[in-house]
Design a protein with these regions (language model features):
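Acidic Asp/Glu-based divalent-cation binding sites
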Residues: 3, 155-156
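Alpha-helical transmembrane segments that form the membrane-embedded catalytic/substrate-binding core
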Residues: 1-18
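Membrane-interfacial segments
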Residues: 21, 25-30
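Conserved NTP-donor binding/palm subdomain of two-metal-ion nucleotidyltransferases/polymerases, i.e.
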Residues: 31-153, 159-434
Length: 434
């Protein structure tokens, strides 16, 4: 270990000098993201999505269907959009493209159908074992869509700390496996599970939001005293709390690297279905207390104006917020901002800035390049047992960025910092930061 430290610290010092110089150079640049308007393809995509979700006519003008289907796939909305598009004259005019896309859609829907059935069966077994997991998102949102298995998603379970390990053991007993090391199970906020030969994918949550993230831990207190209800055989949050969770879950991912259009669909359909069971005044106060009220108002506007989901938005909510920049960012980023590595890496910049805004501290480029140990523990598990190896992790992270740049992909560290700064301006627009 001592040799590793010595060798690595030498590289670390050299890398630090270069990065500080680069940070100074970049700080002089005043590049800002000015084009936050929707492109023609994005506008057409939204028109088709609105028709698919809420009914109505498809665009009369010429549509770039390969681009539309690519965007739909990135947004995990391909089956939903294809269902609306396949009955149009365009299907005959683009027969080869529609035939290939149809096979892709059939595969996705069949996978989702199997996933849904296996999850329902597994959930019954967990309840029979005396456990009380709460279902969030997933099938509870899917049932609100015209065709529920056309909404492609995994499944999430929220369970008390007291039952977490027992639930883990039951999942293993039912053939699921996890990559999370055994010594991390006792403290992990969430653990992911898959099943060999099955499309089943489950995230088991001890906390709904990462308790180690200063920017998100404050969200957990809303869900500490839930009174679950039964919906379609699943134990879940009451409608008000579930809508709050959908909004804050979207907010969390927006702050990190981005969210997709499907999250706005979920939010809108939930608000429409359970409108009279929502305490809209309290919801606004809750969102406002965590700097999420303007973001939530934009989410509601997207659902109503761009997706055609009709529901009243009582005072003090306002629909005057400009939602187009948020929409553009969502369509560029894909589901959870996963379209490219640059966007994913930029989360270090945005999270650092949000944390700084909460504490009154100043956001730092160096903190972005050299983040705290807690941020790196998931990627570099050895930090949990050997926190003094943090400089080693920094160097490994820098080397990882360098290898990505050499591979020819546009996801360098400087690119991530630039995108992060652009997204910080977007967060200021929606009141997340001052």
């Amino acid at each position: 270990v001592d040799d590793v430290i010595c060798n690595t610290l030498g590289a670390f010092i050299g890398s630090t000098s270069l990065l500080i110089a680069r940070a100074i150079e970049k700080s002089r640049e005043r590049v800002r993201h000015t084009n936050m308007t929707l492109t023609t393809t994005e506008t057409q995509f939204l028109h088709i999505a609105k028709a698919a979700i809420s009914g109505g006519d498809l665009p009369a003008e010429k549509v770039d269907w390969p681009a539309i289907f690519t965007l739909a796939n990135q947004q995990k909305l391909l089956p939903i959009l294809f269902e609306a598009a396949r009955a149009t004259p365009a299907a005959g005019e683009n027969a080869a493209l529609f035939a290939v896309t149809k096979q892709q859609v059939i595969g996705q829907v069949l996978n989702q159908t199997v996933r849904s059935a296996e999850f329902a069966d597994l959930y019954r077994k967990l309840r029979s074992a005396g456990l009380h997991p709460i279902v969030v998102k997933g099938q509870l949102c899917s049932r609100l869509y015209p065709l529920k298995d056309h909404r492609i998603s995994a499944d999430d379970l929220y369970i008390s700390d007291a039952e977490f390990m027992a639930c883990h053991e039951q999942l293993l007993a039912n053939g699921l496996t996890t990559d999370t090391p055994v010594d991390e199970l006792a403290t992990a906020d969430e653990v992911s599970y898959t099943k060999n030969g099955s499309p089943l994918y489950i995230e088991l949550h001890r906390h709904l939001f990462d308790s180690s993230e200063d920017a998100h831990d404050e969200l957990n207190h809303f869900f500490t005293d839930l009174k679950p209800i039964e919906v379609d055989g699943f134990s879940t949050m009451p409608p008000h709390e579930h809508l709050l969770y959908l909004l804050l879950h979207a907010y969390k991912h927006f702050v990190r690297s981005g969210i997709g259009l499907r999250q706005f669909c979920d939010i809108g359909l939930w608000a429409w279905e359970y409108h009279d069971e929502i305490d809209w005044q309290r919801l606004h106060e809750q969102c406002e207390s965590v700097h999420a009220a303007t973001f939530a108002a934009a989410a509601f506007r997207i659902a109503r104006d761009y997706l055609g989901i009709e529901f009243d938005l009582p005072a003090p909510w306002s629909d005057a917020v400009d939602a187009e920049p948020l929409l553009h960012d969502s369509l560029c980023g894909g589901v959870y901002g996963s379209n490219d590595l640059t966007r994913l890496h930029s989360s270090t910049v945005t999270l650092n800035a949000v944390k700084a805004s909460r504490t009154g501290a100043k956001s730092s480029v160096l903190r972005t390049v050299f983040p705290k140990r807690e941020y790196l523990e998931r990627r570099y598990p050895y930090l949990k047992k050997r926190p003094y190896l943090l400089p080693v992790a920094w160097v490994q992270r820098i080397a990882h960025y360098a290898s990505e740049k050499q591979s020819g992909t546009d996801n360098s560290a400087s690119g991530s910092i630039k995108l992060g700064k652009e997204r910080i301006e977007l967060m200021k627009r929606y009141g997340i930061m001052d």
